[in-house]
Amino acid sequence: MLVTMKKKSERTLRNRLLQVGMVMAAAVILFASMGLPAQAGKKRRAQTAATPLTYGDAYIIKFDGNGATGGVMDDMVLPTGLAYPLETNRYTRTGYSFAGWADASGNVYNNNQIVQNLKNGRIESRKLAVFSAGFPINQALKFRSTQGSVVFDRNGHRYLAFTASINDPSYYAGDLSHYETAVLLYDLTTGQLVADVHNLNFDHGNSMCYNPDNGHIYIAEGGSLPGYPSGIMELTWDLKAIDSHGFPDLGRAFSITYANGQYFVIGKGPRDGDATTLFRLNSDMQMEDHFNVSKWYPAGYSPQGIAADDHFVYCIAANFSHHQWKKSQKVVVFTRNGLYAGTWSLDITKEAEDMSILGNDVYITTNDKTATTLYQSVLPSVKLYAQWVPAR
């Protein structure tokens, strides 16, 4: 059902989102870099030796302290079909001794036990609704593209914000006489449009994120053509523009996300031929580090939107050499330190534009030209709970 400025959202068809995991050589490199144990009998190898290997659908193992009073555990990413030891327990609990792990089904695992196929890696994505971009101020025209989006929680409500623009041939020829942008904000709790703003000075608005610490929305402006805005635009949560951020090393900002006090931006430097780079910024939008990630994008793929959680950055990539989106879209996954973790395939038949992660909920929006479709999914993961016995 199309959601307009007056109609409510409605759950409709289901769509399957498949993830095809690709890991570094022997899956040792990533885990070693995160402090995880190397495979038994093998030494840890340098990151420079990494070569992506296709094993099938990947899944995440999450470790829950289950009452622990100390210690921190990293997530693991494993492809189906690969046997690999669980990370050494680093949780502690006062007055108790660690007795292994258990999953929600009651299966029990020893410390460092070699496991395989704890999850099939496949997640189902359901289509929530189609949200209208409305009309340009000049209603004789139509929006030609919906781009970046973000789903966020505020004051007990869940919202969707997304951008729209008239990027027609005149726009690409440098004629802005009728070019128009829009940002729309829908309340997913009620299905109602609650705010919209037209003609903010951004180019495309490729990607968006929300910072819950200050309540602001950020737009990666895009910079598709010389002279067009190419940095980061900052808005209040209700779409009032308040600032714009530029960076000497960042010529074109394609994607942005925020998680746990850090922003992550996919972009390129100011010079032609600069590599696709993952930039990490602190909470004050100051550059902390950057990582050349171009070699991890399949040939011909371009950056779309991104999302992040406690451990990983998830980057949508699309191949625009043809529009068979079901075959030409990927999610490239990196650690927060820029190390390659894997590549998943998207089984969505429309152009996937942006991605948001809220806890276990994953949201993906697509470009429907005059609207955007919102899908909801869950990352393929299994949670292992620490088991404790009273200390003797």
Model segments located where?
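Secondary-structure capping and domain/repeat boundary segments
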Residues: 41-116, 120
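Short coil/turn segments that connect the beta-strands within blades of beta-propeller domains
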Residues: 156-159, 213-215, 260-262, 310-312, ...
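Structural motif
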Residues: 170-183, 225-234, 272-281, 322-332, ...
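Blade-loop segments of beta-propeller domains
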Residues: 181-184, 190-214, 221
